[in-house]
Amino acid sequence: MKIIIILFVTLVSLSAYSEYTVDQETINFDSNGVSIAYTVAGEENATPVLMVMGLMASHRLWGEYLVNGLVDAGYKVILFDNRDTGDSENLDRLGKPRIYWKFALSYMGIGFSAPYTLEDMAADGIRVLDELDIDNAHIVGASMGGMIAQTIASSYPERTKSLVSIMSTSGARHLPEMSRQNQDNFSGVGELDSEQVHAYGFYPEAMGRQLTAILQAGDRSEQIKTITVPTLIQHGIDDTLLPVEHGKHTAELIQGSEIIIYDGMGHNLPDEVVPNVLSDMLSFFDR
């Protein structure tokens, strides 16, 4: 099915992140009835950075260079798995949404419910901070994680030192869809094997639930306009899943925000671009 293939490509597009296994233990706690897993790297009293990964992607996909770079720069990096992903709780008990029907309702502008929402996932991130007795943190999110990070910044400004939204979107309906070339490439994508499933912390039945959360949120432009914290938008000029116009529109909505567009970056963080992404992020934090 095309929808499954699209979601698989979205996941695999993050595979340029090298696997990162932090030495510290992974801790699970209860977030309003859902077990959420997190781990921490860096000094206890360092300035915290909460990192939110994208659709169906484990926190391990942030990569060694970016996480170690933040730690080496003196930051405390908090990595967690979104609900239904990685070491956090699998929520198959919530059922499998009829995703084509959700797409149809979304296209027609008709509201619908979701097994859980972007707000729920944002609340999970805030509860991670609560578990660590952290008042506020820099919030960094990629792709769907960027949507969650935007939601944290708008709904919990007092917990947000700053927002970094990477290769993400406002969800506005007028923005361009993925390129035809990218759609044509989907036909060559195979199925995940069991080794890949475990490596990515990927629960196949969860794809529809997370996508439904994105569709249910719809156009978040009005919510994003309320963001008042310092904001950096980072986007790749070669992104064919969320074309660069998505990042530009998000920047236009947030007063005083900054956008940096990277050559050679698609809907991923390739090794040759990560040093610039990290450097720009650190400069932004230091202001």
Model-derived regions: residue spans:
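Flexible "cap/lid" loop of the alpha/beta hydrolase fold
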Residues: 147-154, 163-190
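Conserved acidic catalytic loop of the alpha/beta-hydrolase fold
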Residues: 109-115, 119-137
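Active-site nucleophile elbow and catalytic-triad environment of alpha/beta-hydrolase enzymes
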Residues: 206-223
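Catalytic active-site module of serine/aspartate enzymes centered on a nucleophile-bearing elbow/loop
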Residues: 257, 261-287
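Acidic catalytic loop of the alpha/beta-hydrolase fold
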Residues: 238-242
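Conserved HGGG/HGGXW glycine-rich cap/lid loop of the alpha/beta-hydrolase fold
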Residues: 34-103
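Short alpha-helix in the alpha/beta-hydrolase fold that links the catalytic acid
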Residues: 229, 243-250
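Short beta-strand/loop motif that positions the catalytic acidic residue
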Residues: 227, 233-235
